[in-house]
């Protein structure tokens, strides 16, 4: 769950 959330933020940051 945390990885999914982190990944989503990382993509948005890009």
Curated annotation (Swiss-Prot):
Dimer of two identical or nearly identical subunits of about 32000 apparent MW. This is Basic lectin B1. One of its GO terms (molecular function) is carbohydrate binding. Keywords: Glycoprotein, Lectin. It comes from Psophocarpus scandens (Tropical African winged-bean). The keyword Glycoprotein applies. It comes from the Eukaryota. Glycosylated; contains about 9% carbohydrate. Heterogeneity in carbohydrate composition may result in different isolectin forms.
